[in-house]
Amino acid sequence: MTEVTIRAFAQFRELFGAETPLEVPAGSTVADALVQFAKTVPSAEAELFENGELKGHVVLMYNRERIDAEDAAELSLEDGDEIVLYPPVSGG
């Protein structure tokens, strides 16, 4: 098993909590971890996924680097990795 941390900011922090430790099977990707996270945090699925796909407007960071949904499906996780979630930016 691989232990990672999921951190949430802004509106997501209110919905999901600030920090969630998560154990995923070895070889899991960022996308796999987010699917598992959505199963453990009830409000996460509706906010992060649409029709089983990660919503494109969710801002993802992986170990302090911004990634997109396609990257999330390819990046393998290691112990201690961090995934950060930001809601879409809006306003003016």
Where do the language-model regions lie?
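Ubiquitin-like/PB1-type beta-grasp interaction modules and other compact soluble beta-rich domains
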Residues: 1-91
